[in-house]
């Protein structure tokens, strides 16, 4: 009896997390893995995160719909932890359908997911405009933060409210009565027309209704039926509102713990946790970045890696791989294996550096401090590795990769004590090596 009580259920779910500041290349991995799983779930964030997928000579950027939508046998779910801009969602559905992929019957949206309203976007921009210089958070202006603020203040409007016009009108009028006072009295800006928003959002109910369901119930029934689930995170661990470089973070939990609260899938159903990291480091917007390179090397990384934000188009800051930060992310999210992306960006570097520790006030430290007042003062300590000066794009196995590229991967495994199982050696689906 004791053995039965304490036995662990067979794991049905895998979590995929970014282990840096976002933009790690999760889209390619999800696209590749989607034919191995029955269901792909997006569990947090909103249209502030872009996942880029390259296939059949096309490059597609998705912000809300899970990357698995391009596998015709895969069911995609937008979970309760996501905040949804209905305009962005409908545009994305149209984009996918224009590419020849049927969405109906394959896309499910949580009835409990919160909505991003026009006043959220307005307040997002107004709030950011009041901050100066380095204090700016670097928000995308998509209304993500204000929507989450309303969610936790218990004032949010959810997808289920969109389907009941009377409830929608009541909640919109109640919310805008308060928001307009803030906009006019504090920010001294023109108030938002309540009736115009009501008219606009009333039209979304028919368009979104076919996709809406209780996804928590749906997912757990699928687990009982033996289906497998891939839980896809947006952004990265270092942007987590609780565990990231606060205050320069996102408004949700990209770490693996957020996968459960943002989907309704319990932790005991999770088996593997795959961490995705670039072979170097990038960051968009403000915030501490110990290995940032403001020189020709940083410029080269950005140019070769095409480092521009998929959502905002902003130029990404670039630097060497930071093992101190990466080790922290691996620990916080309980990463069981790593997927290394954009290794090909390093193909032309004779010398490659990796940060192995920091110097802080004359002392060497190995733990990652998330607080700005400490992280802003650290200096990276680097280990130099030999570059490979060759392409690995045609390699079909780890053994076929250049010996120095193999040495780089092996070094990361030893330093992080986590196996690297997936190596992206180019943007295409077939430019992938498994270890």
Curated annotation (Swiss-Prot):
It comes from Chlorobaculum tepidum (strain ATCC 49652 / DSM 12025 / NBRC 103806 / TLS). Its EC number is 6.3.4.4. Keywords: Cytoplasm, GTP-binding, Ligase, Magnesium, Metal-binding, Nucleotide-binding, Purine biosynthesis. NCBIfam families: PRK01117.1, purA. GO terms for biological process: 'de novo' AMP biosynthetic process; IMP metabolic process. GTP binds at residues 22-28, 50-52, 316, 342-344, 424-426. Homodimer. SUPFAM superfamilies: P-loop containing nucleoside triphosphate hydrolases. Its cofactor is Mg(2+). Binds 1 Mg(2+) ion per subunit. HAMAP family: Adenylosucc_synth. Pfam families: Adenylsucc_synt (PF00709). GO terms for cellular component: cytoplasm. CDD domains: AdSS. IMP binds at residues 23-26, 48-51, 140, 154, 235, 250, 314. One of its GO terms (molecular function) is magnesium ion binding. Substrate binds at residues 310-316. Plays an important role in the de novo pathway of purine nucleotide biosynthesis. Catalyzes the first committed step in the biosynthesis of AMP from IMP. Gene3D superfamilies: Adenylosuccinate Synthetase, subunit A, domain 1, Adenylosuccinate Synthetase, subunit A, domain 2, Adenylosuccinate Synthetase, subunit A, domain 3. It is found in: Cytoplasm. InterPro entries: Adenylosuccin_syn_GTP-bd, Adenylosuccin_syn_Lys_AS, Adenylosuccinate_synth_dom1, Adenylosuccinate_synth_dom2, Adenylosuccinate_synth_dom3, Adenylosuccinate_synthetase, P-loop_NTPase. Mg(2+) binds at residues 23, 50. The active site is at residues 23, 51. Pathway: Purine metabolism; AMP biosynthesis via de novo pathway; AMP from IMP: step 1/2. It catalyses: IMP + L-aspartate + GTP = N(6)-(1,2-dicarboxyethyl)-AMP + GDP + phosphate + 2 H(+). This is Adenylosuccinate synthetase.
